[in-house]
């Protein structure tokens, strides 16, 4: 797969992201105006890949302008206003991923110095979410920390720490089942809980990956969000492509990515998901972060073989190589 050809094919997906960027720099899910900072960062990674620096820089500035004095950011904005009064542990640290992707494209050696004080504050605050066994509570509000840790949030915290070249984290894996999903909800139903540990390189067994993938992969369509539901989602499929790729399951990554390309519509934009029993796209939205995820996965697939070339490489592939060498 050639990146220049795919870059042209996916350009409308990138343009859709820019079309949904507000004047203040925030990137909405779609025309309805909701902005999730984590998804905003996902879109920034895609913009960095396309070297859309004006939109990228506006988006980065918006993010840091909305970091509070404690190094936290609201989990959702609507009409440029914060919606909730709690904070999620993995949101603020994720900004280092788009910054690192920009570094790789621009062939720079460090994050912009003007953001260093806030980045330091973000990661200092992150320590307040961590327990004695290295696990992170997923959220906190005025009453204190939540009583639960999530695989998804924790894995992206570890990815963000790696992007900052911090490998000091150490999870006591013997307490995995005890620590995660303490609210009693069975999250093994969700594909993200399967593949995120591989993306974070906490797990790395190729055979186990493909075995678990069978529970979620629908051949010819993509990856289901929830095991028992006939619903493939394009973002989860794209993230699973990344996880498979960095884990060495390259054929699986290529198959999934080729499957989801069929869902690009006549305008070149991807839907959020497809309910294959009813043969309908659901929900009725074309989320920007879904289109960003496709771009990131496609770029990774096209460039991962150039592992000796730092410049222009994909941030997730680059981080997986950093993990292997440390």
Identify the residue ranges that each predicted region occupies.
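Well-ordered alpha-helical scaffold segments within catalytic/enzyme domains
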Residues: 1-3, 41-55, 93-111, 155-168, ...
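Hydrophobic core segments within long, regular secondary-structure runs in both alpha-
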Residues: 7-18, 41-44, 53-64, 93-96, ...
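Extended ligand-binding clefts on enzyme/binding-domain cores
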Residues: 12, 113-238
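Helix-terminus loop motifs that line ligand-binding clefts
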Residues: 51-106, 110-111, 117-130, 258-285
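Short, mixed-charge aromatic SLiMs
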Residues: 64-75, 124-128, 175-181, 217-228, ...
């Amino acid at each position: 797969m050639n990146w220049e050809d795919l870059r042209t094919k996916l350009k409308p997906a990138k343009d859709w992201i820019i079309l949904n960027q507000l004047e203040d720099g925030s990137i909405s899910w779609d025309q309805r105006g909701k902005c999730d900072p984590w998804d905003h960062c996902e879109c920034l990674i895609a913009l960095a890949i396309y070297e859309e620096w004006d939109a990228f820089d506006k988006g980065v500035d918006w993010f840091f302008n909305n970091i509070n004095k404690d190094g936290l950011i609201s989990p959702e904005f609507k009409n440029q206003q914060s919606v909730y009064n709690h904070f999620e542990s993995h949101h603020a640290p994720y900004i280092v991923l788009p910054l690192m992707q920009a570094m790789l494209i621009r062939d720079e050696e460090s994050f912009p110095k003007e953001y260093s004080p806030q980045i330091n504050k973000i990661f200092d605050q992150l320590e307040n979410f961590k327990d004695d066994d290295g696990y992170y509570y997923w959220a906190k509000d005025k009453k204190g920390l939540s009583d639960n840790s999530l695989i998804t949030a924790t894995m992206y915290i570890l990815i963000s720490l790696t992007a900052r070249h911090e490998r000091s984290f150490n999870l006591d894996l013997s307490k995995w089942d005890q620590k995660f999903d303490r609210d009693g909800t069975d999250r093994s139903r969700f594909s993200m809980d399967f593949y995120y540990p591989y993306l974070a390189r906490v797990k790395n067994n190729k055979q186990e990956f493909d075995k678990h993938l069978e529970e979620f992969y629908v051949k010819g369509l993509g990856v289901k969000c929830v095991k028992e539901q006939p619903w493939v989602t394009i973002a989860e499929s794209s993230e699973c492509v990344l996880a498979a790729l960095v884990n060495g399951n390259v054929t699986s990554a290529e198959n999934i990515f080729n499957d989801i390309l069929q869902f690009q519509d006549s305008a070149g934009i991807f839907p959020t998901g497809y309910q294959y029993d009813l043969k309908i796209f659901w929900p009725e939205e074309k989320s920007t972060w879904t289109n960003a995820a496709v771009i990131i996965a496609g770029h990774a697939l096209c460039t991962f073989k150039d592992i000796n070339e730092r410049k222009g490489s994909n941030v997730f592939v680059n981080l997986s190589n950093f993990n292997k060498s440390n």
